[in-house]
């Protein structure tokens, strides 16, 4: 199990943690992150998310996930695990609930934790090539996690790129 995972929930949605620890452990193993590396995952209210967006981005809007990297860490390799302070992933379950219309709430949570985790590792979707790389890896990670946890097949809606699915202001 991941050694320095800090989970926090101020959102009022008590089922946010469902398999979050297992997912993070899977991401550490799959992307060759040393299990002693720090990661924070927080589930917050829509008002808290808007406050973060205003403070850090100057934008007053809803968002489903934000990532705040600390150390510059990229995925490691089988022979060389990377170690450091990854940073924090912040998820708004209230927004997630609105987005998860045709698939289970927890599936959207998994997607956003993976998405946020990849941002902490330096992945981005600011241009077409980086977007393709990030979302291809994101889909593969989701599919592999679902297979590992016997969760069935993820819906196409959570494995396609965000520009093809309904959006509520993702970054």
From Swiss-Prot:
It comes from the Bacteria. Binds 1 zinc ion. This is Endoribonuclease YbeY. One of its GO terms (biological process) is rRNA processing. It is found in: Cytoplasm. It comes from Tropheryma whipplei (strain Twist). The lineage of its organism: Bacteria, Bacillati, Actinomycetota, Actinomycetes, Micrococcales. The keyword Metal-binding applies. HAMAP family: Endoribonucl_YbeY (MF_00009). Its main location: cytoplasm. Keywords: Cytoplasm, Endonuclease, Hydrolase, Metal-binding, Nuclease, Ribosome biogenesis, rRNA processing, Zinc. Single strand-specific metallo-endoribonuclease involved in late-stage 70S ribosome quality control and in maturation of the 3' terminus of the 16S rRNA. The keyword Cell inner membrane does not apply. One of its GO terms (molecular function) is zinc ion binding. It is an enzyme of class 3 (hydrolase).
């Amino acid at each position: 199990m991941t050694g320095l995972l800090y989970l926090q929930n101020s959102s009022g949605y008590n089922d946010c943690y469902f398999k979050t620890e297992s997912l993070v452990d899977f991401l550490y193993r799959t992307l060759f992150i040393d299990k002693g590396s720090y990661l924070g995952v927080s589930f917050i209210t829509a008002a808290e998310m808007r406050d973060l967006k205003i403070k850090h981005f100057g934008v007053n809007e809803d968002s489903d996930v934000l990532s705040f990297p600390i150390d510059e860490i990229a995925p490691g390799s089988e022979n060389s695990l990377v170690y450091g302070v990854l940073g924090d992933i912040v998820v708004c379950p209230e927004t997630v609930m609105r987005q998860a219309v045709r698939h289970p709430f927890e599936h959207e949570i998994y997607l956003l934790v993976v998405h946020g985790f990849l941002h902490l590792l330096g992945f981005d979707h600011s241009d077409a090539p980086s977007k393709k790389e990030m979302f291809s890896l994101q889909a593969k990670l989701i599919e592999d996690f679902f297979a590992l946890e016997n969760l069935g097949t993820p819906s196409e809606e959570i494995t396609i790129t965000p520009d093809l699915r309904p959006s509520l202001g993702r970054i």
